[in-house]
């Protein structure tokens, strides 16, 4: 499996795990006396989505694959959701909980688990 794809998937998984923990904290904001690194994790996830998109859209071995088309679509929607959250002045636990519950984000994660397994088998 391409190192770039592998690293991007790994970063998305790490970020999602942090998002689950942040959502449970009940915070009204990521700012204040004890700022949270949630914004950093969301930004890393967003950047990883960019990397995956460029890898999947331009790699010839993924051309004409309906599954990859769906993966790309799910990544684009998830990336857009992350961008919306990153534009917010305050990122609350509730916002992150809603991101976690998004069918688009969950679909992307499931797609990436499948893609990761398929690419491991091919190498």
What are these regions (language model features)?
Residues 82-123:
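Amphipathic alpha-helical binding modules
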Residues 22, 26, 52-55, 59, ...:
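Hydrophobic stripe of amphipathic alpha-helices that form coiled-coil interfaces
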Residues 70-80:
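Short, well-ordered alpha-helical segments
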Residues 1-39, 111:
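Short terminal alpha-helical segments
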Residues 12, 45, 75, 105-109:
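Alpha-helical transition-metal enzyme core signature, strongest for iron centers
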Residues 32-39, 69, 95-103:
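Short, charged, amphipathic alpha-helical segments
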Residues 48-69, 88:
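Short, solvent-exposed, charged loop/turn and helix-capping segments
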């Amino acid at each position: 499996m391409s190192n770039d794809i592998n690293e991007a998937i790994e970063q998305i998984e790490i970020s999602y795990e942090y998002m689950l923990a942040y959502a449970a904290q009940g915070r009204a904001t990521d700012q204040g006396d004890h700022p949270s690194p949630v914004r950093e994790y969301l930004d890393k996830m967003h950047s990883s989505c960019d990397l995956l998109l460029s890898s999947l859209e331009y790699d010839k071995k993924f051309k004409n694959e309906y599954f990859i088309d769906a993966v790309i679509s799910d990544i684009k929607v998830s990336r857009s959701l992350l961008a919306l959250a990153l534009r917010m002045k305050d990122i609350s636990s509730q916002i992150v909980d809603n991101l976690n519950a998004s069918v688009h984000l969950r679909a992307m994660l499931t797609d990436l688990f499948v893609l990761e397994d398929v690419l491991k088998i091919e190498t």
